[in-house]
């Protein structure tokens, strides 16, 4: 009887440890916006929807997607920031246009961005806000 009790306790302990150690992200997604000529770009721009799905599945990083708008042309661009904690604080920032073309890249561990490219990406841009995040507690 004692042996069965100890085995049961052991199984309960292992299951509890595995379940409690599984990290699940807190996800924020603003589906109530229009950008790049489409309602809900997080779903209706295939490349952006793919980035969101990858972010939801990532186990070692956090993702923030911000929406910006050119104050002259009114075109939208997206700023994607990836933050990794497990190897120290590492971040990478990408800028994309509506079609998913990379316009800008910077971050720790990358070749420093060309200052002209960085300036051009942020020139005349108005920050409209965060539209998607994954955060781990």
Place the predicted regions along the sequence by residue.
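Bacterial N-terminal signal peptides that target proteins for export
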Residues: 1-9
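Extended hydrophobic/Leu-rich segments
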Residues: 6, 42-45, 77, 84, ...
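C-terminal motif of bacterial Sec signal peptides marking the signal peptidase cleavage site
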Residues: 18-20
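Bacterial signal peptide processing site
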Residues: 22-24
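Short, non-transmembrane alpha-helical segments in secretory-pathway proteins
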Residues: 28-61
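Mature extracytoplasmic domains of secretory-pathway proteins
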Residues: 49-100
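C-terminal partner/receptor-binding element of secreted or periplasmic proteins
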Residues: 106-137
